Amino acid sequence: MELGELLYNKSEYIETASGNKVSRQSVLCGSQNIVLNGKTIIMNDCIIRGDLANVRVGRHCVVKSRSVIRPPFKKFSKGVAFFPLHIGDHVFIEEDCVVNAAQIGSYVHVGKNCVIGRRCVLKDCCKILDNTVLPPETVVPPFTVFSGCPGLFSGELPECTQELMIDVTKSYYQKFLPLTQV
């Protein structure tokens, strides 16, 4: 399926020197602790909580509308500690997701309306289907598909998943154009 052009109003997005496109309607708390490595798209009404701990996002990632990215935490007898969140390259996070993972590898697709529980680890080349709720501290192995509530193994991905995700995220970035450039 060929992706059509996705047009956006240039005044509604900030484009950084490294090619990141961040919606002015998104909320980046503690922006000094948020690292976007380049050509990443953060769409409207997203929230990234860099005020809690460092958040690193790789290259060619897409975070769609109304998603929340926040670092994981652990409760101790003396309080709560937050830990850094690392997201790899070529990761696609659909609309209305809440991500509270410890780590998301590269070439990962998270479907619409998902909840990624506290301190989950999503390895490289995995897929989370729409409406999935992963319980805290779940580990999703490479080349697997998880779905349901609670999220459980439901299938495998082909060996070419890495190439497919590179293709999807790069083409999405190339087709995400300002209205004036058409």
Curated annotation (Swiss-Prot):
Keywords: Acetylation, Centromere, Chromosome, Cytoplasm, Cytoskeleton, Kinetochore. It is found in: Cytoplasm, Cytoskeleton; Chromosome, Centromere, Kinetochore. Gene3D superfamilies: Hexapeptide repeat proteins. The keyword Acetylation applies. One of its GO terms (cellular component) is centrosome. Its main location: cytoplasm. InterPro entries: DCTN5, Trimer_LpxA-like_sf. GO terms for biological process: aorta development; coronary vasculature development; ventricular septum development. The modification N-acetylmethionine is found at residue 1. Part of the dynactin complex that activates the molecular motor dynein for ultra-processive transport along microtubules. Belongs to the dynactin subunits 5/6 family. Dynactin subunit 5 subfamily. Subunit of dynactin, a multiprotein complex part of a tripartite complex with dynein and a adapter, such as BICDL1, BICD2 or HOOK3. The dynactin complex is built around ACTR1A/ACTB filament and consists of an actin-related filament composed of a shoulder domain, a pointed end and a barbed end. Its length is defined by its flexible shoulder domain. The soulder is composed of 2 DCTN1 subunits, 4 DCTN2 and 2 DCTN3. The 4 DCNT2 (via N-terminus) bind the ACTR1A filament and act as molecular rulers to determine the length. The pointed end is important for binding dynein-dynactin cargo adapters. This is Dynactin subunit 5. It comes from Mus musculus. The gene is Dctn5.
